[in-house]
Amino acid sequence: MKDKKRPPSVKPLARERIAVLFSEAEKIFHENPGYSDRYVALARKISMKERVRIDHEYRRRFCHHCSRYLVPGANMRVRVHHGWVAVTCLGCKKTTRYRVERTP
């Protein structure tokens, strides 16, 4: 079965929409964290449907296990180890590790 070709203008629009959803999630988090989680879920759906990667700066702002918007100190714990950073979502207790390169 052949893939349907999408117009080339859809991907930039999807990237822009994802950026808007993450900025809105950041603004509304302290008033209603549930809305922030919903905005992240919508951004992930757009990303999957349009096959657009979520930018690196946004990928670390949500839990990949439960799709919650993460804010350090509020619903996320950050621990720094040798060579990596451990981020724990306090909603689902899932830990994600990110590699950190040392600066000389």
UniProtKB/Swiss-Prot annotation:
Positions contributing to Zn(2+) binding: C63, C66, C89, C92
Cofactors named for this entry: Zn(2+)
Pfam families attached to this UniProt entry: Rpr2
Cysteine disulfide links: none
E.C. numbers: 3.1.26.5
Cellular localization per UniProt: Cytoplasm
Coiled-coil regions listed: none
Keyword annotations: Cytoplasm, Endonuclease, Hydrolase, Metal-binding, Nuclease, tRNA processing, Zinc
GO cellular component: cytoplasm; ribonuclease P complex
Cofactor note: Binds 1 zinc ion per subunit.
Superkingdom field: Archaea
PANTHER family linked: RIBONUCLEASE P PROTEIN SUBUNIT P21 (PTHR14742:SF0), RIBONUCLEASE P SUBUNIT P21 (PTHR14742)
Family: Belongs to the eukaryotic/archaeal RNase P protein component 4 family.
Role summary: Part of ribonuclease P, a protein complex that generates mature tRNA molecules by cleaving their 5'-ends.
Assembly with partners or alone: Consists of a catalytic RNA component and at least 4-5 protein subunits.
Protein name: Ribonuclease P protein component 4
Gene for this chain: rnp4
